[in-house]
Amino acid sequence: MSRLQTRFAELKQADRAALVTFVTAGDPDYETSLAILKGLPEAGADVIELGMPFTDPMADGPAIQLANIRALGAGQNLVKTLRMVRAFREGDRTTPLVLMGYFNPIHYYGVERFIAEAREAGVDGLIVVDLPPEHNEDLCDPAQAAGLDFIRLTTPTTDDKRLPRVLAGSSGFVYYVSVAGVTGAHAASLEHVEQAVARLRRHTDLPLCIGFGIRSPEHAGSVARLAEGVVVGSALVDRIAKAGSKEQAVGDVLGLCRELAEGVRRARR
């Protein structure tokens, strides 16, 4: 089994949801970002999404857009992001790590080269938000052939006619964007999320992870009762933006991660 399959199987056995945390690689700089990345599993992150900085992150809200600007300004690029994954894997062979971002930097880097180096570095899966299933041959198919999961996003506007096409070829888990719009937007109602989860379960057996707008342990816990995973990104990235020092950024992000993890763990007790 893949690391993602193993992790979700373990959590199903334990009857709890996964805490999926998102941070942008290189934010606010390489060393601080690496310290955060290395600390996330011990702070309670079950799965990590690591953002690949890009100059035009159109699906992201202000917090993550600024994180991209900070990271790029500090010199982060795809080579350094893969180096960061290798450094993380030196001390952690079990926590699933998914790279999330946009196709342009991957295309520029070279798809074949990117897939080979991502696999070698210890990446488990990819989320590429601007690559629809009509372009599976561009990245999804070769990535899966190399052993990388390809995780699709679904939204409230993905209708039943479109949904099977979106889910075809998906692996690892399904990321449900609970509100239409950019990351960090207002949260969807739990009733809406519950209805969406029921609809998705009619189309897939993959674990469902819910994201966008989740900021507090209480909210994370509420969502954890409905799905296999809870994704938190903007709330963590905000802690980096507001920190007065690099040391505080590490401490604040990991502190919030611990609080969120406790909220998720309490959800089904």
From Swiss-Prot:
It catalyses: (1S,2R)-1-C-(indol-3-yl)glycerol 3-phosphate + L-serine = D-glyceraldehyde 3-phosphate + L-tryptophan + H2O. Tetramer of two alpha and two beta chains. InterPro entries: Aldolase_TIM (IPR013785), RibuloseP-bd_barrel (IPR011060), Trp_synthase_alpha_AS (IPR018204), Trp_synthase_suA (IPR002028). HAMAP family: Trp_synth_alpha. CDD domains: Tryptophan_synthase_alpha (cd04724). Its EC number is 4.2.1.20. Keywords: Amino-acid biosynthesis, Aromatic amino acid biosynthesis, Lyase, Tryptophan biosynthesis. One of its GO terms (molecular function) is tryptophan synthase activity. Belongs to the TrpA family. This is Tryptophan synthase alpha chain. One of its GO terms (cellular component) is cytosol. The alpha subunit is responsible for the aldol cleavage of indoleglycerol phosphate to indole and glyceraldehyde 3-phosphate. The active site is at residues 49, 60. SUPFAM superfamilies: Ribulose-phoshate binding barrel. Pathway: Amino-acid biosynthesis; L-tryptophan biosynthesis; L-tryptophan from chorismate: step 5/5.
